[in-house]
């Protein structure tokens, strides 16, 4: 039987739904409709129902969804009913900012090690973590059962660091900038390029003008 392929956009929206639902729960709201979720996150009610339908039947027709239960189901789908230990490679400006980003902790991602090969950075502390040399990665990965790594190094070093992390049996990597990393098929890599996000914004700013010309 062929495995069901879940669109990545659906997974992204599930994360957005969960945050919206958590805000409702904080306000004491116990039941919500697909229309209310859709309005709150900027999609159609049909899209909400379709995204949830990939994973089963949720809610009651004419009543809606139990907010607490739906939060639990979505967090379970996203693998967020347990904490995840993460290491960060690169203690420069980006790495420092990521290490102190509260949003990771709030979603259950705990940075347990920060690494760099720059002798001027090794030994310094970022928040409550000491910057360690790359040679210490295997030790920390094993000690904390790390599955995920964030790579925040110069573009020319990303592939080398990715190779080292894969060699240490990590299967999930997050990278930054315009770089394509070559990894084995069983390793998941996701890239964040902030310049691309800005280009999407500029496209939307000029789209109406371009459309009128075309």
Swiss-Prot record:
Keywords: Cytoplasm, DNA-binding, NAD, Repressor, Transcription, Transcription regulation. Gene3D superfamilies: NAD(P)-binding Rossmann-like Domain, Winged helix-like DNA-binding domain superfamily/Winged helix DNA-binding domain. It is found in: Cytoplasm. InterPro entries: CoA-bd, NAD(P)-bd_dom_sf, Rex_DNA-bd_C_dom, Tscrpt_rep_Rex, WH-like_DNA-bd_sf, WH_DNA-bd_sf. GO terms for cellular component: cytoplasm. GO terms for biological process: negative regulation of DNA-templated transcription; response to redox state. SUPFAM superfamilies: NAD(P)-binding Rossmann-fold domains, Winged helix' DNA-binding domain. Its main location: cytoplasm. Pfam families: CoA_binding, Put_DNA-bind_N. It comes from the Bacteria. GO terms for molecular function: DNA binding; DNA-binding transcription factor activity. NAD(+) binds at residues 90-95. Modulates transcription in response to changes in cellular NADH/NAD(+) redox state. Belongs to the transcriptional regulatory Rex family. This is Redox-sensing transcriptional repressor Rex. The lineage of its organism: Bacteria, Bacillati, Bacillota, Clostridia, Thermoanaerobacterales.
């Amino acid at each position: 039987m062929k495995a069901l392929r879940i669109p990545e956009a659906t997974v992204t929206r599930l994360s957005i739904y969960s945050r919206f639902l958590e805000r409702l729960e904080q306000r004491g709201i116990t039941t919500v409709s697909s229309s209310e979720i859709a309005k709150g996150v900027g999609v159609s009610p049909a899209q909400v129902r379709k995204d949830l339908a990939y994973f089963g039947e949720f809610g009651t027709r004419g009543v809606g969804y139990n907010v607490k239960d739906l939060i639990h189901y979505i967090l379970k789908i996203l693998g967020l009913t347990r904490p995840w230990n993460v290491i960060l490679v690169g203690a420069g400006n980006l790495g420092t900012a990521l290490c102190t980003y509260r949003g990771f902790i709030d979603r259950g991602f705990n940075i347990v090690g920060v690494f760099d090969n720059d002798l001027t950075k090794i030994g310094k502390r970022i928040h409550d973590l000491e910057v360690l040399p790359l040679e210490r990665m295997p030790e920390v990965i094993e000690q904390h059962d790390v599955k995920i790594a964030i790579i925040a190094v110069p573009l020319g070093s990303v592939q080398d660091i990715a190779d080292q992390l894969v060699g240490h049996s990590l299967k999930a990597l997050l990278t930054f900038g315009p770089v394509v990393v070559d990894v084995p098929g069983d390793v998941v890599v996701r890239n964040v390029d902030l310049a691309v996000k800005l280009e999407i914004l500029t496209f939307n700013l000029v789209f109406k003008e371009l459309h009128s010309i075309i």
